[in-house]
């Protein structure tokens, strides 16, 4: 759809670098699931979602996005440590909602792992840290539109990527890393 295409072409400032939303979302989906797309069941049948569609659903339809099985877990030790439901597949996929149910276990595990330091971590410990980081990114996306509506100044204190609209030639909207104080990511997304 045109909306997804336009959203994917917008620029986002992430970690001091300007990149297209499609690249930003694609990187996060690849890091979270190990793929650049995934299939979900809908009332109309199976549907393939792109990284941009996933990110937009997280931001504007979190009740759907939290059910998508996008968190890949490769190690049984991680499943056991976080008390996740077992699955037959070797490469297990969990939803945000399933991980949220185990948030306390995940937080406890992350705290214990961080006390050990960065060196000599097992692959399972590294996977838990990665899982928690990816969970936090998705949680941020799911909260971003609510935060911007309820308390826009909170965005200044948080490390969310930012989209900035600016006027282009003939009044056309362009996207840039040079912020206009009056507009933020929500307004940028809403103007699509």
Each predicted region: which residue ranges?
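Soluble extramembrane regions of membrane proteins in the secretory/endomembrane system
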Residues: 1-192
């Amino acid at each position: 759809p045109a909306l997804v295409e336009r959203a994917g072409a917008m620029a986002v400032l992430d970690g001091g670098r300007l990149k297209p939303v499609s690249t930003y979302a694609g990187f996060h989906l690849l890091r979270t699931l190990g793929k650049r797309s995934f299939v979900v069941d809908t009332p109309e049948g199976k549907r393939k979602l792109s990284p941009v569609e996933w990110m937009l659903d997280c931001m504007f339809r979190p009740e759907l996005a939290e059910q998508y099985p996008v968190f890949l877990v490769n190690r049984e030790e991680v499943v056991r440590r976080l008390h996740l439901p077992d699955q037959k597949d070797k490469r297990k996929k969990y939803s945000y909602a399933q991980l949220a149910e185990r948030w306390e276990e995940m937080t406890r595990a992350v705290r214990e792992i961080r006390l050990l330091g960065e060196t000599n971590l097992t692959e399972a410990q590294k996977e838990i840290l990665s899982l928690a980081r990816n969970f936090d990114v998705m949680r941020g996306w799911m909260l971003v539109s609510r935060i911007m509506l309820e308390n826009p100044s909170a965005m200044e204190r948080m490390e969310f990527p930012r989209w900035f609209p600016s006027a282009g030639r003939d009044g056309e909207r362009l996207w840039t890393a040079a912020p206009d104080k009056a507009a933020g990511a929500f307004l940028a997304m809403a103007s699509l």
